[in-house]
Structure formats: C-alpha cells, structure tokens
Amino acid sequence: MRVILLGAPGAGKGTQAKFITEKFGIPQISTGDMLRAAVKAGTPLGLELKKVMDAGQLVSDELIISLVKERIAQPDCAKGCLFDGFPRTIPQAEAMVAAGVDIDAVVEIAVDDEEIVGRMAGRRVHLASGRTYHIVYNPPKVEGKDDVTGEDLIQRDDDREETVRHRLSVYHSQTKPLVDFYQKLSAANAGKPKYSHIEGVGSVESITAKVLAALS
C-alpha cells in the first residue's frame, strides 16, 4: 500500500505516520532522506543530484520523480511505502501520475490554523534532555522550568507564532491545493487513490483509529 499523508505543519502527521508504518510494515520515505542516500551511494542519479546541489540550485521535480521511482523499486518498498512531505505541489503530483507512480490512499488530517498555532506556540523544550512540555496541555510543575533539573525551558524558533503562521501560509498556497487535486483524481478514477478526510482534533488514539480505519 502506497500512502500519502496530507495536512498542515503541526497537524500530527508525524505521529500518525509512525502508527501507519508499524501497522502495515512499510517504510516512511522522505525526499530529503532519498537525496542524501542517493548522493552518498554515488549512483548515476546521485552524482547528477550532487552536481545540482553543489551548484546551489534547486533539484527539479523531474529529478525528484526519478529518485522516487528508484526508491520505491527497492525491496523494503515491496509492500508499499508512506510518502513523507511529498508531493508538496500540484506539478509534483501531476509528475507522479505521468510517471505511473500509483498511489493507493491519500489521507488528509485537517486541523484549523488557530488550533495549530495554539499547539505549536505553546511548546517549551529543555534543550539538554529534549524533554518537551506545553504551557496548556502538559505544563511543567514550575512555570518555565524543567521538572527534573529545574533548568530553563525555551521556545524553539520553529514554534514561535510568527514562524508557525508563515509556514501555514506557505502550506495553504502550495500544498493545500493537493487536497482538491487528489479528490478529483479519486473521483475520476473510480476511487483510486482512496481519499479520506479526517478531523485531526481529539486524542491521539481516536485519530489513529480513524486513520487506520480509512486505510483498511
């Protein structure tokens, strides 16, 4: 089963991806990991990619699709895979269709922007240990201090409200149109890929149950 997870940053895709890969015994593949692996392995495609990256240029969708086709032909993808952060744009999605990369299921995890801002902007981290807190959902015993060491907690730059809102605006302009693209593709293609819209609010367990039900 080949699965694409859609959803804004902070919607909980990473958490659900873990459950999907474990349940179906499929790898999670990201373009970043694929790029690094191909360059490291020195494959013909990897050497071509290295040239582009060394020149400080953006890797074309065409090269990315070649990379995807090479990756999904590997033995660990025999039962399928979960695409992580790909496709990000309509041209990439169209290129996958044109290249004959079939997708079985597309799951959209939908969460309101304000909910996401609240989730992410409320995170606090103890840098030395990696322990994470949330000022509303999982507050430390003493405000701004790590429970174990009493050291200061920080807010990562990625979690600052203005950063989160910028990432959400990029998502809405570039990636959200994929929702419409895959809904139309599914409707025009007798339900392949199977498209599922899931509300990403509630307990992790309840969302996981809905995601797995959509894929079964």
Swiss-Prot record:
Q: Which GO terms describe its cellular component?
A: cytoplasm
Report the domain of life of the source organism: Bacteria
Database matches in PROSITE patterns: ADENYLATE_KINASE (PS00113)
Q: How does it assemble?
A: Monomer.
Q: Which NCBIfam families does the entry link to? A: adk, PRK00279.1-1, PRK00279.1-2, PRK00279.1-3, PRK14527.1
Q: What is known of its domains?
A: Consists of three domains, a large central CORE domain and two small peripheral domains, NMPbind and LID, which undergo movements during catalysis. The LID domain closes over the site of phosphoryl transfer upon ATP binding. Assembling and dissambling the active center during each catalytic cycle provides an effective means to prevent ATP hydrolysis.
Name this protein carries in UniProt: Adenylate kinase
Q: Which organism is it from?
A: Pseudomonas entomophila (strain L48)
